[in-house]
């Protein structure tokens, strides 16, 4: 079982950097799994593999040490995020739209920072808000395509498949909410294994009721490979991120997570044959730039709070 006890800060940070790479693979792999097995069956297999991974790396938490609010509200919020994300990818209509939906979901870093400022009293600077605007502008550029932004084009793309985009936004908001709850109620408890077990049960029940089983009855070779790599990637991402957060450099890991969309796009070009125009890449650049600006504004604020806290302790 992985443990941060015997790792230095630099070693733990290097392990934590595995998480953004694995998350960058997730959008395309989820789509491949859905196409190979159907939504519920594919995700059931995915989370079975992931659960085995985290059982051996993270282990089961002590229920007696979990805050009741975290258990009853926080963990279900994480499950809702997983379900919304998978439904968003499954209901997308093509390779490029899958990436658009994925980019909407990738608003979670900026939303997480915003929630931390609003609900967790994290200090920040004024350029947080321009950063949020830039990140949202990137989504607008992506949805408008290579022809440039127009309200008509934006409305047409959204009207084409609104459910998928709304689900992606729901996934982003709920993940940001879960992150905020983790900061407030999580303590030292790591509930990853519980979350994965519940996710497995949810998709298992959906599969039994025949939900999302239309694409392929018996799975394809591409779907099987996607399940294996997807399960390992998701499990490794959670395990690595948890270890990195517990002992590594949080600032470096937070900055690295904002490059997940870029890694996702690179992986998609050969895994799901996504055709990405220049407008899409311009939007990716804006999302990354806006998210980094948000991180910098919050990072400076957190450093200021730490300095103030040390001064108060010295005065006492």
Language-model features, listed with the residues they occupy:
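Glycine-/small-residue-enriched transmembrane alpha-helix faces in small-molecule transporters
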Residues: 1-41, 84, 137, 150-184, ...
């Amino acid at each position: 079982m992985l443990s941060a006890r015997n790792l230095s800060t630099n070693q733990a940070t290097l392990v934590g950097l595995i998480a953004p790479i694995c998350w960058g693979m997730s959008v395309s792999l989820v789509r491949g799994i859905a196409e190979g097995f159907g939504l519920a069956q594919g995700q059931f297999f995915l989370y079975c593999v992931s659960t085995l991974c985290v059982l051996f790396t993270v282990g089961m938490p002590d229920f007696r040490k979990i805050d009741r609010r975290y258990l009853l509200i926080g963990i279900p919020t994480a499950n809702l995020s997983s379900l919304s994300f998978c439904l968003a990818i499954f209901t997308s209509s093509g390779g490029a739209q899958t990436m658009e939906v994925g980019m909407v979901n990738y608003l979670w870093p900026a939303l997480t920072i915003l929630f931390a400022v609003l609900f967790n009293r994290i200090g920040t600077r004024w350029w947080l808000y321009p950063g949020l605007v830039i990140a949202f502008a990137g989504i607008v550029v992506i949805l408008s395509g290579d022809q440039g932004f127009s309200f008509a084009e934006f409305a047409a793309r959204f009207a084409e498949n609104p459910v998928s985009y709304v689900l992606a936004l729901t996934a982003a908001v709920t993940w940001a909410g879960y992150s905020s709850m983790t900061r407030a109620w999580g303590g030292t408890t790591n509930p990853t294994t519980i979350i994965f077990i519940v996710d497995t049960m949810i998709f298992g029940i959906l599969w039994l009721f025949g939900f999302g089983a239309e694409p392929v009855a018996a799975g394809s070779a591409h779907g099987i490979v996607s399940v294996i790599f997807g399960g390992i990637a998701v499990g490794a991402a959670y395990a690595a991120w948890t270890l990195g957060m517990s002992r590594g450099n949080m600032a470096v890991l937070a900055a690295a997570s904002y490059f997940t969309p870029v890694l996702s796009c690179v992986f998609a070009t050969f895994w799901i044959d996504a055709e990405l125009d220049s407008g899409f890449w311009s939007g990716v650049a804006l999302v990354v730039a806006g998210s980094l600006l948000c991180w910098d504004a919050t990072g400076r604020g957190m450093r200021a709070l730490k300095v103030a806290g040390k001064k108060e302790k010295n005065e006492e």
